Structures are given as C-alpha cells and as structure tokens.
Amino acid sequence: MTVSKSSLSALTLGAIGVVYGDIGTSVLYAVKEVFGSGHVPFTSDNVYGILSIFFWTLTIIVSLKYVTLVLRADNNGEGGLIAMLALASQSVKDKPALRRVLLLVGIFGTCLFYGDGVITPAISVLSAVEGLEVVSPAFNKFVIPLTLLVLFGLFWVQKRGTAGIGKFFGPITVVWFACIAVLGVAQIATHPTVLWAISPYHALSFIWRQPGTSFIILGAVVLCVTGAEALYADLGHFGKKPIRVAWFAVVMPALTLNYFGQGALLLNNPAAVKNPFFLMAPDWALLPLVGLATLATVIASQALISGAFSVTKQVILLGYLPRLKIMHTNVKEVGQIYLPFVNWGLFVTIVLAVMIFKSSSNLASAYGIAVCTDMLITTILTFFVIRYSWKYPLWLCVAATSFFFVVDFAFWASNLLKLFDGGWFPLLIGGAIFILMITWKDGRRLLNDKLRADAIDLNSFLEAVFVSPPVRVEGTAVFLTVEAGTVPNAMLHNLKHNKVLHANNLFVTVHNHEVPWIGMEKRLEIESLGHDCWQVIINYGFKNDPNIPKALQHIKGRGCDLNDMTTSYFLSRDTIVPTIGSGMAQWREKLFSQMHHNASGAADFLRLPNNAVVELGSKIEI
C-alpha cells in the first residue's frame, strides 16, 4: 500500500506520540539505574563501555529485531503478541500438541503484559515527578502524593475518551524528543570524545574485562528498551513505514544523543549519578522540564492503558476471559473503547506498586522479568511464523531468530537476579491473570461439552414442532445459541411457558476466529430451515466489534426482512453449579462459576437493544 507524503507525515507524527512515548521516557531512569547500582566504578572506559552497550542494545533489539524483522510478521496488517500468536498457532494447526503449547506460551506472554502495564506507568510518572527533588530536596515529601494525583487524573479521564486531547500527543512527544536531544548535545559538547562509544569495541571490551558485572547490569540496561513491544503492537494503527521512519529519523537519534549526553555529564561530574537526566538541564529549565517530563510519561502511560483495553477485548473474543462491560468513547472510531473494570483494576494495582516500592529506583528492580519473558516469547513465535507460515528454510529461520534468542535470554537471565527485589510483583500479577484465563477457557470447554451432550438437533426438533404447530405471533425472534444446529434453551423455555412461536425465527451463533478482522463479505452464513426459520452464523475476528443488530441488517433481501420495532432477542442466562469429578479442580470450578456469574451480559456485549431482550435462566452442572 502506497502512502502519500502528507499521510506519511501525519502517521509518523502519530506514531511518535503513541508508539514511542514509553521508550522515549526511559531516559529518565535507565542511566541512573545502571551507574547508581554501585556495580560500575566511574572510569572513562567503563562509561564508554556502558554507553556502547546502551547503543547496541537499542540497535539489536529495536532496530534489528522489532523494526526490521518482527514488523514483517503482520497478521492481515495487524501486530501485537495476540496477532502473532494467532498467526503462529494457525501455521501449526496440523500439529495439535505443538499448537496447544504455543497457545499456552502466547497467552502467558499476554498475561505478563498486564504486569508490565502496572510497572511502566508507575516508574515513568514517579521518575518524572522525582525531578522536583533536584529542584529542591524540600519537595521530597510531595513526590508520592503528586504521583498518585497525576495517575488518578489519568485514569479518571479514561471514561470520557481521549479523542479530543489525543491529537496533541504527537506534537508534545516531538517536543520531548527535541528537548532530550538538545540536552544531550549540550553535554556532549563538553566531552565530545564520548561519541566514540558508538563503536561496538567499547561494549565488547567492557564485557570481556568485566563479564560478571556485565551480566548483572543487563538487568538495568533493559530499561532502555521499555515499550519496544509497542512498535509491533501498534502496527495496525500506523503501518510499517511510519513506525520505521519515526524510529530512524527521530527517536533513535534523540535517545542516542541523550544517553551519550548523560554519559558526558557523569564523566565531568560523577556526583550527578543521583539523577543525571535532570542534572543535565540548567537551573532555570528544571521546573519546565519536570512539567514536560510528566506530560510525556502521562502520554506514554495513556498508550499502555489503551493497549490494555484493546488486548482485553481481543482476549475476550478469543474466549480466554468472560465478557466485561465495554463502553465506546467515540462513535466514529470503534477502536476507542473504555473498560471500567480494567481501568480501575489497573489503577488500584499501580497505586499499590507506588506505595510498596516508593521510588523509581525500587520500581526498576520490579521491571524487566515480565518484559524480557515477552521478548523471548515473541522471538519463539516469530520462528514458527517464518518457518511454518512463510515456509522459509530451517537454516534461515534458525539463523534469523537464534541470535535474538541468545540476546533476549541473556537479558532475561540477568533479570532473574532481581526476582526477590521486586521482580516477583509483575510475575505475580501475570500469573494470577493466567490462572483466570486458563480456568475460564477450560470452564467454557466443559460447559460447551455439557451443552453439546444435552443438545437437541434443531432440524429434528422443528420437524416435530410443526407436526402440530404452536400459535404464531407477529415479529421476529432471534435466539442466540452457542452451538449451531442445536435447539437453544431460550427457545425451549419460551415454548414451554409462552406456548407461541414468532412469525420469523433466527437461530444465531457467533463464531470468533483467530484472525484480526473478518469483512462483511464473510460476516454472515445463512441457511433456511423452512417454516420461516433460519440458521445464521456471524463471524468475527478478534479485533472486530461484535454488533448483532448491525450484522443482521445484512440479512435483508436474503429471504428474511427484519424490522427493528418487531424483533426480540432471546438469550439463555445460565447459572453454573460446580460438581465433583468434572475435569477441573473444585477450586477452579468455583472460580469459573464466580467468573461466569460476574460476567457482563451478552446483551450489552453484543450491542443488543435493551428494550428488545428477553433472558431466560437455567442451571447447568459441570
């Protein structure tokens, strides 16, 4: 697809604001954590070596792995771990055991995204507000309250949508990158030889001289690639070219200049290690810089929150979470959604993280394990995509991914050292969500097996009913059923208690597929069952927005004309009764039952009109 120059500029500006906000604010804390750890003495060789490791980490992980390789593995134009998981699992669908392992690995990686979603806003906003301590130590007692206030404001505005202020994200982030580049250049001018650190010689020399220290500091160096996954996750919003142009033309140069500027500052003044980013600025610029940094971290956090909403919706459609209330904050953009449960759940957990760890340095200990695990999983899934989906030779697939796997593994192993210092926190969050997802998936499988075992064949049932047909009333009845070709419980209850049948009857089954989008040309499958009854299958991808009434509008002219005023939707509202020996542990059955009970109603999730829905309940033992 060709992109015009004006469109490319607009998309590149948008990508800078949304895709690179997170990695752009890593300059606030990455260098401080590496040199502030006390593991690295302040010598010119060591500073050059660390800066070189920073530069080549950005080059290998971001420029080569994500921007060059991973961006190519799009799923119908979409990116992100779920899109790659769907692509990888489809490529090995003839290997069911391997497919199940990949699904579990991919879903676990998705769960770790939520752990990262807690740490990243906390460490970003906290590190920005900590700049006040550089202005005056008297501000120290205000850092945590101000951080919590900023975070509360950020989460509170989510329900109102960000369409109005979102247009400012790109320009503000461009100003941020320009600012950090200028700060870096000013310091490099005082010590220009620091630019020699671009040579990989300095990184390799440092690793050769201090292998143990090198391994330890990788756990802090990984902070410089926070948000690298966003490059791939936002592929569908901006496209490959704008993301690549933004990285190579703006983001990478600005980050390099700032990191090298901080290195130059430390060579001139090792005491600046307490907060090298803010100490690069002149005194008169400190307060404005704190304000700009706070804005930049809020924008970075906003992108992550929006990502959490989007990922949760995708996971729900793939059947790994129960339905949650989804509100559309922009009638023109279906992708702009708000999930109250996810929003306030994230907020409470982030507040907990801030209160537990209390500083960006302590939070840095919690960061890394979840992200590095996701990086490893992305590399593994990429191998299966290029091997089994693209059909590349095995040697080429191994060559393309093994190098990145070794690099990712080195960072992951180093971050394991931080497990008991805080790394447990995102793992605990991700592990808890993984248990919820797997329990829901297994519970739904058991429930569907039970429904299938007790199901009545729809065609046979209709033949029997119309031997002595019930009273027909005007209008259309839409019965939602999990399994196509079976009689929905709602219809059985309707016939039993009301003893009537509508003039038109649609038996609707929703199928969610492991592809991002399904267009309208493949949305509906319709089969006439006679007696003014139809079987309708509605197909959605995991990025589609389920809307049953809108989908059924396309049935007009195909044998059945719908009138919104005379259409009723019949749903079954099942109550789960856990039993012993069903295939899941008793505690998981109870957990599934509670999740099922608290799930948002199908009517809201499928956008059914409130005044046209009839819910009929039943109890099901599993």
From Swiss-Prot:
GO cellular component, one term: plasma membrane
Annotated keywords: Cell inner membrane, Cell membrane, Ion transport, Membrane, Potassium, Potassium transport, Symport, Transmembrane, Transmembrane helix, Transport
Any one GO molecular function term: symporter activity
Protein's organism: Albidiferax ferrireducens (strain ATCC BAA-621 / DSM 15236 / T118)
Protein name: Probable potassium transport system protein Kup 1
Known role: Transport of potassium into the cell. Likely operates as a K(+):H(+) symporter.
Family stated for the protein in its record: Belongs to the HAK/KUP transporter (TC 2.A.72) family.
PANTHER family: LOW AFFINITY POTASSIUM TRANSPORT SYSTEM PROTEIN KUP, OSMOTIC STRESS POTASSIUM TRANSPORTER
Subcellular location: Cell inner membrane
InterPro entries: K+_transporter, K_trans_C, K_trans_N, Kup
Superkingdom to which the source organism belongs: Bacteria
Membrane-spanning residues: 11-31, 50-70, 101-121, 137-157, 168-188, 215-235, 247-267, 285-305, 337-357, 366-386, 393-413, 419-439
Enzymatic reactions: K(+)(in) + H(+)(in) = K(+)(out) + H(+)(out)
UniProt topology in membrane: Multi-pass membrane protein
Signal peptide: none
